[in-house]
Amino acid sequence: MFDAAPIKKVSVVIPVYNEQESLPELIRRTTAACESLGKAWEILLIDDGSSDSSAELMVKASQEADSHIISILLNRNYGQHAAIMAGFSHVSGDLIITLDADLQNPPEEIPRLVAKADEGFDVVGTVRQNRQDSLFRKSASKIINLLIQRTTGKAMGDYGCMLRAYRRPIIDTMLRCHERSTFIPILANIFARRATEIPVHHAEREFGDSKYSFMRLINLMYDLVTCLTTTPLRLLSLLGSVIAIGGFSLSVLLIVLRLALGPQWAAEGVFMLFAVLFTFIGAQFIGMGLLGEYIGRIYNDVRARPRYFVQQVIYPESTPFTEESHQ
């Protein structure tokens, strides 16, 4: 077994999108958790194009005396995982922890993740206990987790929880990947030699509403299906073969019945023919739509456009500066 490098510095990466109500409490509690580690630490807040005063609060926190907070401002909303990747590109720690800004996963769990990673794990995931989400969110999460487990073969219990710890080599490897649709927990587990999970507390959301609407969850499902595997395309080929064989068999059967029962029966079977035809057409459209998803993602990857555009980075006790597009 390989000995893992000691953890000397911890970086906490937090994507922020319209979280002005929770930010002061988030910063206070995360700072307190990091101070208890007995290691060097930093907090990176990434504003993902917020329309409220989240960015102003972040900048103010970075400019306070003895601040350990780095604020990264994106020029618009790129999504949670793109914002986290923007944070990854600015970390300096040996262990990187991701955390949502809504305080549903308590920052007080950070020392437990660090302690577990100190045992030599490359990735430390978490499983939310007594989830305080709606039935719809819980059901969608179960479906997504089952889909990921079946596709990747890695039996992690809760891929949807972003409270996770990654060692620096895993982060550096993910930054070298250039997929447009990135689901960080899965990508990290692909490269991790040793991964584990620990149970964590899950609190009810105190401020605002979830940023994952029904349509965003549907889009996430499409992202997972098309970025993880080509199995759906193989299933389409199998389905096409079954339909072709079924259609040929049905044609033979109809010809035999036509000859046996006469032309009167043929007229009575028109509606059945239409039903079969519409079934085949529906299957074709489903296949075309799924194939289009794959082609669209290939097109986006070939264009190689940046995943995000960093507008400003504010370091503690430093002057804000403007950057070019990154990653």
Curated annotation (Swiss-Prot):
InterPro entries linked: ArnC_tfrase, Glyco_trans_2-like, Glycosyltransferase_2, Nucleotide-diphossugar_trans
Cross-referenced CDD domains: DPM1_like_bac
GO cellular component, one term: plasma membrane
Transmembrane regions listed in the UniProt entry: 236-256, 270-290
Keyword Membrane part of the UniProt annotation: yes
Membrane topology reported for the UniProt record: Multi-pass membrane protein
Subcellular location: Cell inner membrane
Periplasmic side: 257-269
Pfam families for the chain: Glycos_transf_2
Enzyme Commission no: 2.4.2.53
Keywords (A to Z) from UniProt: Antibiotic resistance, Cell inner membrane, Cell membrane, Glycosyltransferase, Lipid A biosynthesis, Lipid biosynthesis, Lipid metabolism, Lipopolysaccharide biosynthesis, Membrane, Transferase, Transmembrane, Transmembrane helix
Example GO BP: 4-amino-4-deoxy-alpha-L-arabinopyranosyl undecaprenyl phosphate biosynthetic process
UniProt pathway annotation: Glycolipid biosynthesis; 4-amino-4-deoxy-alpha-L-arabinose undecaprenyl phosphate biosynthesis; 4-amino-4-deoxy-alpha-L-arabinose undecaprenyl phosphate from UDP-4-deoxy-4-formamido-beta-L-arabinose and undecaprenyl phosphate: step 1/2; Bacterial outer membrane biogenesis; lipopolysaccharide biosynthesis
Top-level taxon of the source organism: Bacteria
Membrane topology, Cytoplasmic segments: 1-235, 291-327
Reactions that this protein is recorded to catalyse: UDP-4-deoxy-4-formamido-beta-L-arabinose + di-trans,octa-cis-undecaprenyl phosphate = 4-deoxy-4-formamido-alpha-L-arabinopyranosyl di-trans,octa-cis-undecaprenyl phosphate + UDP
UniProt-recorded Gene Ontology molecular function terms: phosphotransferase activity, for other substituted phosphate groups; undecaprenyl-phosphate 4-deoxy-4-formamido-L-arabinose transferase activity
Family of this protein: Belongs to the glycosyltransferase 2 family.
Summary of the function given for this chain in its UniProt record: Catalyzes the transfer of 4-deoxy-4-formamido-L-arabinose from UDP to undecaprenyl phosphate. The modified arabinose is attached to lipid A and is required for resistance to polymyxin and cationic antimicrobial peptides.
Record protein name field: Undecaprenyl-phosphate 4-deoxy-4-formamido-L-arabinose transferase
